[in-house]
């Protein structure tokens, strides 16, 4: 059931889609505010994500989507409010960032692969230095993660030898190898052409089908409608409307109606 999130009534958002009602909440944002200088980017953002849920966050540029995602992984600190992920208080000044980053994987639009390392070495790097795995174990885990995204045969290739879609899939494998409880995707297909976009979206759809908890900032409306358990529409730093995928066919607010019309 769709809900309209007014600034004074953000608690309306604390509704988990029916298929996920039995699952515990793994991500919780409560009245989160964030400013950059005098520019207030997040204005009382509140929502919850159940374990195994796939949430798509949509909205115009500057609506706060990516900032919300970055705050979840403590890449940005919030001004007020609270964020909890997998039992970790992200807003705690003393939060163990190494523990948080083991629980949360994040993939960006830019691939951030090391050009001097081959694909396998890129995926193994965090396993060796963060998880302290020996080389044999890190290799086994990395190859399994690459197989999960369909790139195990490219283990010996270097980033410059891969297409943009393949590089993005390596970036996803690198995060998956750490066995996170939550995966965050920040407009990961926005720099790819339609053909390469499709191969990345298929990997993400497989992850969602496998029960991975995912938050996805995207402009791929058809994908969001088809795959997401719920869609969150953000507008001017607030959660404005939230509901299942078919809410895109029946938007409640004029703001979402205008956003969808502009996206056509």
Please place each PLM-identified region on the residue numbering:
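ABC-family P-loop ATPase nucleotide-binding domain
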Residues: 1-33
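C-terminal boundary and immediately downstream tail of ABC-type ATPase nucleotide-binding domains
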Residues: 2-4, 10-11, 233-236, 242-264
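Polar/charged alpha-helical tracts
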Residues: 8-12, 18, 136, 158, ...
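ABC family nucleotide-binding domain
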Residues: 24-29, 33-244
């Amino acid at each position: 059931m769709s809900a309209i999130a007014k600034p004074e009534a953000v608690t309306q958002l604390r509704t988990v889609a029916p298929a996920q009602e039995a699952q515990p909440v793994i991500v919780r944002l409560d009245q989160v505010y964030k400013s950059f200088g005098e520019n207030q980017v997040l204005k009382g953002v509140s929502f919850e994500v159940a374990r195994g849920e796939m949430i798509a966050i949509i909205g115009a540029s500057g609506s706060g989507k990516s900032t919300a995602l970055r705050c979840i992984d403590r890449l940005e600190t919030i001004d007020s409010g609270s964020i909890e992920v997998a039992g970790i208080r992200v807003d705690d000044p003393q939060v163990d960032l190494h523990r948080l980053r083991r629980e949360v994987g994040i993939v960006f639009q830019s691939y951030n692969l090391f050009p001097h390392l081959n694909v396998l070495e890129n995926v193994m790097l965090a396993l060796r230095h963060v998880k302290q795995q020996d080389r044999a174990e890190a290799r086994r885990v990395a190859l399994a993660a690459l197989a999960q995204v369909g790139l195990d045969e490219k283990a010996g290739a270097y980033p410059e030898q891969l297409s943009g879609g393949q590089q993005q899939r390596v970036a996803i494998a690198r995060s998956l190898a750490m066995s996170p409880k939550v995966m965050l995707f920040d407009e990961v297909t926005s720099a790819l052409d339609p053909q390469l976009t499709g191969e990345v979206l298929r990997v993400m759809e497989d992850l969602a089908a496998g029960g991975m908890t995912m938050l996805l900032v995207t402009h791929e409306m058809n994908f969001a409608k088809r795959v997401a358990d719920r869609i969150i529409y953000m507008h001017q730093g607030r959660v404005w409307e939230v509901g299942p995928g078919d809410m895109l066919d029946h938007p409640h607010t004029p703001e979402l109606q205008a956003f969808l019309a502009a996206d056509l």
